[in-house]
């Protein structure tokens, strides 16, 4: 099985940041990306398990994968 988190277009390390900082950093990073590019987000704030999927729905980005069983959490989104 292939790891969906390999070879993202951009990576954002949000470890150590607490709500609302991770989502603010994601938003800032996504603004600088082209439609269709992927972003790997690495975080350790439990609030991201709710906030990142919600951000993707609200901003119409696609959440391609998420791994939240252990720290650090990983999310892969595609800019919509």
UniProtKB/Swiss-Prot annotation:
Highest taxon of the lineage: Bacteria
Supply the alphabetized keyword list. Cytoplasm, tRNA processing
What Gene Ontology terms describe what this protein does at the molecular function level?
sulfur carrier activity
Q: Does the keyword tRNA processing apply?
A: yes
In this protein, the active site sits at 19
Q: Where in the cell is it found?
A: Cytoplasm
**Which Pfam family is one of this chain's hits?**
TusA
A biological process term (GO) from this entry = tRNA wobble position uridine thiolation
| Primary subcellular site in the record, as a coarse category | cytoplasm
Coiled-coil stretches are: none
**Any one annotated GO CC term:** cytoplasm
Pathways involved: tRNA modification
**Record's subunit section:** Interacts with IscS.
Q: HAMAP family per the record? A: Thiourid_synth_A
Task: Report the protein's function.
Answer: Sulfur carrier protein involved in sulfur trafficking in the cell. Part of a sulfur-relay system required for 2-thiolation during synthesis of 2-thiouridine of the modified wobble base 5-methylaminomethyl-2-thiouridine (mnm(5)s(2)U) in tRNA. Interacts with IscS and stimulates its cysteine desulfurase activity. Accepts an activated sulfur from IscS, which is then transferred to TusD, and thus determines the direction of sulfur flow from IscS to 2-thiouridine formation. Also appears to be involved in sulfur transfer for the biosynthesis of molybdopterin.
Q: Provide the family line.
A: Belongs to the sulfur carrier protein TusA family.
Entries under PANTHER family matching the protein: SULFUR CARRIER PROTEIN TUSA, SULFUR CARRIER PROTEIN YEDF-RELATED
Q: Which protein are we looking at? A: Sulfur carrier protein TusA
What is the species of this protein? Pectobacterium carotovorum subsp. carotovorum (strain PC1)
- What lineage is on file? Bacteria, Pseudomonadati, Pseudomonadota, Gammaproteobacteria, Enterobacterales
